[in-house]
Swiss-Prot record:
Belongs to the TRAFAC class translation factor GTPase superfamily. Classic translation factor GTPase family. CysN/NodQ subfamily. Residues 168-171 are annotated as: G4. It comes from Escherichia coli O139:H28 (strain E24377A / ETEC). Residues 92-96 are annotated as: G2. This is Sulfate adenylyltransferase subunit 1.
C-alpha cells in the first residue's frame, strides 16, 4: 500500500468507511489521444505520480525500467507506467488501449490511453466509445496535425462533448505564450467544422516537467486558468441517456429455478419502476414490472447504467436481444439505416458485402447497400468513394435481415451503436453509429436477396473477366 492511500484510509476512519466514500464519488471516464509522440502516456504517468497513486514497488520498478527502456535520459520515464507491451516499450510508442484507474478527494477516474499512430486508429475508436471526455494532446513544436483532426472527429462522432486540448511540451518552446495562442487559434478554426455543441478548453502544460498538470506552473505566469487536474475534477458531465426514454436490452433470461423468471441486463437509458407498464419489441406484447431485482436486493426503481433483473407479471416469450420500453412509446422496428462507420479491417468495406452485426445484445446480419461518402479528416469534407479502406470513416447504408429497434447514436449509444463481424473469421472489422434509422415506408425494396448480392460481389471481385453486371449499380 502506498503512503498516500494509507493516509486517506486513516482520514476516513478505516477501510470500510473509505470504501463507502469511494462509492459515492462521481466517476469520469476520459481518454488521451493525439498524434504519435505527443506525450499521452507520459501525461497519464505524470497524473498518477503527482496524485500519489503509485505504490512503492511500482516506483522502484519504474526506476529500473527507465534505465533499460527509458527515453528521457536520467529522468524517470513516466510513460512506462502505462506502456505495458514489450513492443511498446521497445519502440517507445503506444499500440494497445491501456486503461488506468485513479481517484482524488473530489472524483474517481478511468483513463484510456490510446495510440497515436494512424494504423492504430481503430484502437483509438475502441477506447473513445466508453468515454465522456477527451484530452487531445498537441506537441507545442508541431501544432495541429492530421491525427489531431482525426481523433477530434472520431471523438465527437462517438458522442464526446467535452474536449480538453492539452498543448504539451511547452518546456521545449520556452513556455511561449505566442506559441500557445497560435495553436489555440488554429484548433478553434478547425473545430468550427466539428458537429455538435462542444465544450472545448485549452491548457498549456509539460507532462515531463509537471507544469500545469496537477499543480500550477511557475514558468507560465501568463496562464491564469485551471490546471489539467482541476479541469478533470470540476467539469460537469451531463449524460445524454439520463434524459432519454426507457430502453432495456435483454442480455439473458435468468431462470435459476422453477419459481423465478427474470430478464437481466443493463438499463441503457431512462428509468424504470415497479408497476410500470412496459412493451417488448419486436413482438409488441405488453406487461407490468412486478419486481426489480439487484445484487443488493429488490428496488422500487432503477436508473440508466444500473445492472438489474426485471420480473414481469405475465409469462411472455422474451429472449436475448429483445428490447423493453415504456408501453406508451411508439418506436417502430426498421430494416434499414444510414450508419457512420469507422472501418478497422485491411479488406475494404464495399457495397454488396454482408456482415454479422451485433447491437445491444442482439446478433443479426446486414448487407451494405452503398457508401454515401468518406470523410476527409484533413478538412472534414465529404467525397464519393467505391469502398471504405482501413481507418476510413464514412456514411454507409445498411439493410438488416430482420427488423430492428434502433435509436440514433447521439441519443442512445447502446441502442444506436453496433459492430461489424466478419462471418468467416469472426473478427470485429468495423464500428458503426446509427445516423438515421430508415422507416419501412421510406426504405427502398430490394429485388435481390442478400445471398444474390453477396454472390454477385464475389464474382465481380474474383472473376472480372466474366463481365458480371453490378446488381446494386444497375437497379
Amino acid at each position: 500500500m502506498n503512503t498516500a492511500l494509507a493516509q486517506q484510509i486513516a482520514n476516513e476512519g478505516g477501510v470500510e468507511a473509505w470504501m463507502i466514500a469511494q462509492q459515492h464519488k462521481s466517476l469520469l471516464r476520459f481518454l488521451t489521444c493525439g498524434s504519435v509522440d505527443d506525450g499521452k502516456s507520459t501525461l497519464i504517468g505524470r497524473l498518477l505520480h503527482d496524485t500519489r497513486q503509485i505504490y512503492e514497488d511500482q516506483l522502484s520498478s519504474l526506476h529500473n525500467d527507465s534505465k533499460r527502456h527509458g527515453t528521457q535520459g536520467e529522468k524517470l520515464d513516466l510513460a512506462l507506467l502505462v506502456d505495458g507491451l514489450q513492443a511498446e516499450r521497445e519502440q517507445g510508442i503506444t499500440i494497445d488501449v491501456a486503461y488506468r484507474y485513479f481517484s482524488t478527494e473530489k472524483r474517481k477516474f478511468i483513463i484510456a490511453d490510446t495510440p497515436g499512430h494512424e494504423q492504430y486508429t481503430r484502437n483509438m475508436a475502441t477506447g473513445a466509445s466508453t468515454c465522456e471526455l477527451a484530452i487531445l494532446l498537441i506537441d507545442a513544436r508541431k501544432g495541429v496535425l492530421d491525427q489531431t483532426r482525426r481523433h477530434s472527429f472520431i471523438s465527437t462522432l462517438l458522442g464526446i462533448k467535452h474536449l480538453v486540448v492539452a498543448i504539451n511540451k511547452m518546456d521545449l518552446v520556452d513556455y511561449s505564450e505566442e506559441t500557445f495562442t497560435r495553436i489555440r487559434k488554429d484548433y478553434l478554426t478547425f473545430a468550427e467544422q466539428l458537429p455538435g455543441n462542444l465544450d472545448i478548453r485549452f491548457v498549456p502544460l509539460s507532462a515531463l516537467e509537471g507544469d500545469n498538470v496537477a499543480s500550477q506552473s511557475e514558468s507560465m505566469p501568463w496562464y491564469s486558468g485551471p490546471t489539467l487536474l482541476e479541469v478533470l475534477e470540476t467539469v460537469e458531465i451531463q449524460r445524454v441517456v439520463d434524459a432519454q426514454p426507457m430502453r432495456f436490452p435483454v442480455q439473458y433470461v435468468n431462470r435459476p429455478n422453477l419459481d423465478f423468471r427474470g430478464y437481466a441486463g443493463t438499463l441503457a437509458s431512462g428509468r424504470v419502476e415497479v408497476g410500470q407498464r412496459v412493451k417488448v419489441l419486436p413482438s409488441g406484447v405488453e406487461s407490468n414490472v412486478a419486481r426489480i431485482v439487484t445484487f443488493d436486493g429488490d428496488r422500487e426503481e432503477a436508473f440508466a447504467g444500473e445492472a438489474i433483473t426485471l420480473v414481469l407479471t405475465d409469462e411472455i416469450d422474451i429472449s436475448r436481444g429483445d428490447l423493453l420500453l415504456a408501453a406508451d412509446e411508439a418506436l417502430p422496428a426498421v430494416q434499414s439505416a444510414s450508419v457512420d462507420v469507422v472501418w478497422m479491417a485491411e479488406q475494404p468495406l464495399s457495397p454488396g458485402q454482408s456482415y454479422d452485426i451485433k447491437i445491444a445484445g442482439k446478433k443479426t446480419r446486414a448487407r451494405v447497400d452503398g457508401i454515401r461518402y468518406q470523410v476527409d479528416i484533413n478538412n472534414l469534407t465529404q467525397r464519393e468513394v467505391e469502398n471504405l479502406p482501413l481507418n476510413g470513416i464514412g456514411l454507409v447504408d445498411l439493410t438488416f435481415d430482420e427488423p430492428l429497434v434502433l435509436d440514433r447514436y447521439q441519443q442512445n449509444p447502446v441502442t444506436g451503436g453496433l459492430i461489424f463481424i466478419d462471418r468467416l473469421s469472426n473478427v470485429t472489422v468495423g464500428a458503426g453509429m446509427v445516423h438515421e434509422p430508415v422507416s419501412q415506408a421510406t426504405a427502398a425494396p430490394s429485388e435481390f436477396s442478400a445471398f444474390e448480392l453477396e454472390l454477385n460481389a464475389l464474382v465481380r471481385r474474383h472473376f472480372p473477366h466474366w463481365g458480371a453486371r453490378d446488381l446494386l449499380g444497375d437497379k
